């Protein structure tokens, strides 16, 4: 928080929501509800590396949908994937499945039933919303890596240094 402050030095706006204990992503969003407002927002996991063109999501119109997910082909550490994708809609069918890339546009309504301060994951909310046809998605097949472990981060770092 000290390093980035409110983001004004870099031309962005950062608002911090304090968690006394980790609340998972949906719980954290519910905790920050007053900071986020009522408009859809971009959610990006801190432990991914990619060359996805984020500007394509600026002003993304969810319409009546609750989320738009970016999915990727399943990486070796997650071969079963998370969701299906058919006709631009995310689903829960057994196959073919893709992995959530850690990039989404989310309506705050997705977490409307989550109490501020409570621990809650996004995946169950997305599965329920996808079952109602309320989640769209896209498949991204560019450069993407989950760097959520020291080993995966080191492997990517080594690969990026190669000529």
Where are these regions (language model features)?
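Short loop/edge segments at beta-strand edges and connector loops
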Residues: 18, 45, 52, 69-71
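Residue-level signal for inorganic ion chemistry
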Residues: 32, 45-47, 84, 107
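Conserved beta-strand segments of alpha/beta enzyme cores
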Residues: 13-15, 66, 134-136
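Acidic-glycine-rich active-site phosphate/pyrophosphate-binding loop
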Residues: 5-6, 80-87
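Catalytic-core segments of class I nucleotidyltransferases/pyrophosphorylases
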Residues: 41-42, 49, 53-62, 74-77, ...
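Short, high-confidence coil segments that cap the C-terminus of an alpha-helix
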Residues: 38, 64-65
